[in-house]
């Protein structure tokens, strides 16, 4: 009896040891575009694994401005002066949607591309957003509300409104193509803050749900996705979905898992511990980011060191943040150095190890 018991224990021990000794299989997270470039695939997988780390796990980011009008490297210079570090992600907006022009496509400017290419080659990641002009008008009006009937015309390529949208998308795609030709992956964030009532593509009333509007938004998002991905063959984009944290219906506009790589929140706050929407967005099972952040009242009093502490304590799945520039910038608020030097923060120059991304933690 004793001998049999000993043999049984030995078998259990050997089986357990074999299981424990088996290496953990790598879990690959791929972009939604199955034809994504290899570098874009590698960046996506690397980003998705950041929450598994114990440190160096949240990419810092900053908005550099609107191409041609305000974009420059001044924001990264300001942050470096304040902290000794540069943001890992640097953002440009291609669309100056307020601009009154003879042709709506003239509101699109991609002249920030050369700086974004340099930023990538020097260890950073570019992000591009779009404050699109309103195709219901000849130009401008990015904050002018439109009816659902006007929205439908924008989605119809045979109408004047639809042709205006297509003209803008064509010029945007031309700019994105320049970056792809140089092997530069892009965090691409179109149609943000759709659950707010301030952009033409979003809601028209404060926290008033409009199911038809939500459906029209999803159609527009998918139209842009298919144009960029299928028609233009752009395979370097990581698609970012970013509702506003201070409005309801954060996931109602979600176009579906097949169209989004990263989900996030545009969060302007006074209390970093009270940002709404984290649980809703992370429940979509996509990597999560704070796609815009800044003080709700821009008077220089926001302490960004509390923001990174809140990420650690309340929003630990965060893979990056992108702080807005000007008076919202960490450089002119409090705690910038603590934010950029926190053990969780990853800055420009800390993404790559030679020609390879820093190691993934499973």
Predicted features by range, described:
Residues 54-58, 85-88, 122-127, 181-187, ...:
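Loop/turn elements at helix/coil->beta-strand transitions in domains of secreted/extracellular proteins
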Residues 9-18:
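Bacterial N-terminal signal peptides
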Residues 248-300, 338-339, 343-356:
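Glycoside hydrolase catalytic-domain groove-lining segments
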């Amino acid at each position: 009896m004793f001998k049999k018991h000993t043999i049984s224990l030995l078998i259990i021990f050997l089986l357990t040891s074999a299981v424990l000794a088996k290496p953990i299989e790598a879990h690959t997270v791929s972009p939604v575009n199955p034809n994504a470039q290899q570098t874009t695939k590698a960046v996506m997988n690397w980003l998705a694994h950041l929450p598994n780390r114990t440190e160096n796990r949240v990419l810092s980011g900053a908005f550099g401005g609107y191409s041609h009008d305000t974009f420059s490297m001044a924001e990264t210079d300001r942050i470096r002066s304040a902290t000794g570090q540069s943001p890992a992600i640097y953002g440009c907006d291609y669309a100056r949607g307020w601009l009154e022009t003879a042709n709506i496509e003239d509101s699109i400017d991609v002249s920030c591309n050369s700086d974004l290419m340099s930023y990538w080659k020097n260890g950073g990641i570019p992000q591009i957003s779009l404050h699109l002009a309103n195709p219901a008008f000849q130009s401008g009006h990015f904050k002018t509300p439109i009816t659902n009937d006007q929205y439908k015309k924008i989605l119809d390529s045979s109408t004047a409104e639809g042709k205006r949208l297509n003209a803008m998308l064509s010029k945007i795609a031309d700019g994105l193509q320049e970056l792809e030709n140089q092997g530069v992956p892009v965090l691409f964030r179109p149609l943000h803050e759709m659950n707010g009532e301030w952009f033409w593509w979003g809601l028209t009333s404060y926290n008033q749900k409009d199911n038809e509007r939500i459906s029209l938004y999803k159609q527009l998002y998918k139209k842009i996705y298919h144009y960029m991905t299928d028609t233009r063959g752009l395979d370097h984009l990581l698609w970012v979905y970013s509702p506003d944290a201070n409005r309801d219906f954060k996931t109602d506009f979600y176009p579906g898992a097949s169209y989004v790589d990263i989900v996030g929140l545009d969060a302007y706050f006074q209390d970093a511990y009270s940002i709404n929407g984290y649980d809703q967005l992370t429940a979509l099972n996509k990597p999560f980011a704070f796609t815009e952040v800044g003080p709700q009242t821009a008077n220089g009093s926001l302490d960004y060191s509390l923001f990174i502490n809140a990420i650690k304590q309340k929003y630990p799945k965060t893979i990056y943040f992108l702080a807005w520039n000007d008076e919202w910038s960490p450089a002119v608020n409090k705690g910038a150095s603590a934010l950029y030097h926190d053990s969780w923060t990853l800055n420009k120059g800390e993404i790559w190890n030679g020609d390879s991304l820093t190691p993934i933690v499973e």
